[in-house]
């Protein structure tokens, strides 16, 4: 079986291309080139990707260090949080893919080991990255495992994400080794690519993530009822996206206008979308490499 090990330069290129792709498509409620969100400049998302890439691919940093320095330097230049969720989701993948693996299944096994090892690393760096990034709605939570309270430092990172995984999809991804990506998003995107353009497939993927779970950002910022309502609306929209035409494009545009009017931003679904695009690109490269080898 062929071994794979992606260079840091290739991983940086793949990461940036995924961030750029995602910002160009219509993601209802979320920022895009053609539909900016009030107070958010899409060019800053480009810049956030460029800044964070330098620290994410740094071989001298472990997962915690890369996350912390990526967030810290993005905030230093941009002044606010533009990509905490993406950094949290992407960093373990890039660290794993930069080491030897022999298949996508093996990549997932080693990703699990990488995530489990975080507990023995300097997890306070990840906690600090989340604190300084101050993600939307995080101050609305006051229960056990509140990362914004210094009194919760007695909990290790694994214990904290176990608590938050009940409502936060990024924490859940850390707990179950990205099951939602590998077992839901990737197969859905793979099938979409067979039928539709890449642009429309990415838009469908974003709506799909909205439809299968409550968006963590909306849940934190508002409440469970609001998050469920948005997810229900996304399911109805997804049912209309079985063809790629002006009608479906109009459906997405109108849904985008509605969510932005209501100030409902499914930001976590955007993070899941970028992560899926990266793993999909890695999968494609591995598949092509195996074909050439055979």
In which residue ranges do the predicted regions lie?
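Generic recognition of cysteine residues
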Residues: 18-19, 64, 71-74, 184, ...
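Phosphate-rich cofactor/ligand-interacting catalytic cores and adjacent structured alpha/beta frameworks
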Residues: 1-61, 98-257, 261-263, 280-294
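Long, hydrophobic/aromatic-enriched structural stretches that serve as scaffold segments
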Residues: 53-103
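Residue-level detector of well-ordered alpha-helical segments, enriched
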Residues: 66, 85-89, 126, 198-205, ...
